[in-house]
């Protein structure tokens, strides 16, 4: 399999994306965000974008080292960061992490559920353990994070919950039964929770990105990276949702590269 680039090895975001991100500077001043999957890929980009917009950020993820790296970068932006290694499938551990983050930074105003795992395989080759892991992380993990931050948001009668799903949460593909099932589940979970929380003043938003250049995307020859979204493009969508007026709810945001629509690739 072709080697996949690290977060540091990927090219910077397009200038238009960088310019758009810069326009959000200061828009989240005084706010606290919690991000899962914060050490790599979309979670990393989102954490940095939230900090650049003025938020203090609690960084949750499996591995301490990448979380510490992101925390250092956030400190360089003049914001506070709290790095806490946690497995989102462990509900008690997630609740403990949320409490620790609230003690360190304050209660969450924004929570971004970005942690996810892959599970691409034809059904006859899909290992049951792999399927269970995908459902546990990509669906149950989201529920665990939302439950952990929700009490404080209920007290405040406001908050933003952003779920990073996938365009595969609306679009099935052959060879992706396990992953697609988990993302359909993530979308359904989030939209159901959105209906529950309208009256509480809490917005639930689902971002459905497709073809994002992250380390675990299929090899470059299967999807040319120059034609893919950059993680910062997804982070930009999160900032847009996080700064919407409280009375506005945009439940679903499909995000794909224009080139994919014009010249699809398989």
Listing of model-derived features with the role each one plays in the protein:
Residues 32, 39-41:
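Conserved glycine-rich cofactor-binding loop
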Residues 55-69:
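Conserved glycine-rich Rossmann-like NAD(P)H-binding loop of the short-chain dehydrogenase/reductase
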Residues 85-96, 128:
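The beta1-alpha1 cofactor-binding region of Rossmann-like NAD(H)/NADP(H)-dependent oxidoreductases
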Residues 122-123, 127-135:
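Substrate-binding pocket helix/loop in short-chain dehydrogenase/reductase
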Residues 146, 182:
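Active-site helix of classical SDR
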Residues 166:
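Residue(s) in the substrate-gating loop at a strand-loop-helix junction
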Residues 199-202, 206-207, 222-263:
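C-terminal helical subdomain
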């Amino acid at each position: 399999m072709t080697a996949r680039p690290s977060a540091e090895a990927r090219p910077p975001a397009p200038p238009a994306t960088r310019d758009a991100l810069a326009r959000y500077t200061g828009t989240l001043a005084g706010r606290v965000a919690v991000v899962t999957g914060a050490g790599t890929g979309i979670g990393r980009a989102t954490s940095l974008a939230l900090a650049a917009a003025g938020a203090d950020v609690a960084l949750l993820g499996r591995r301490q080292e990448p979380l510490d790296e992101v925390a250092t970068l956030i400190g360089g932006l003049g914001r506070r960061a709290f790095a806490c290694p946690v497995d989102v499938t462990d509900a008690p551990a997630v609740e403990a992490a949320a409490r620790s983050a609230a003690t360190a930074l304050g209660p969450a105003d924004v929570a971004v559920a970005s942690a996810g795992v892959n599970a691409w395989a034809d059904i006859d080759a899909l290992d049951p353990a792999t399927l269970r892991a995908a459902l546990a992380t990509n669906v149950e993990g989201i529920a665990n994070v939302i439950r952990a931050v929700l009490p404080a948001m209920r007290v405040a009668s406001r908050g933003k919950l952003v779920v990073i799903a996938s365009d595969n949460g609306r679009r099935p593909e052959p060879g992706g039964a396990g992953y697609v099932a988990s993302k359909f589940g993530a979308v359904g979970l989030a939209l159901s929770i959105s209906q529950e929380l309208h009256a509480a003043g809490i917005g639930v938003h689902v971002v459905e990105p497709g073809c994002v250049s992250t380390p675990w995307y299929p090899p470059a020859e299967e999807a040319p990276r120059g034609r893919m979204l950059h993680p910062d493009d997804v982070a930009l969508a999160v900032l847009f949702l996080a700064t919407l007026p409280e009375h506005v709810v945009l439940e679903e945001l499909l995000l794909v590269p224009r080139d994919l629509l014009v010249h699809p690739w398989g």
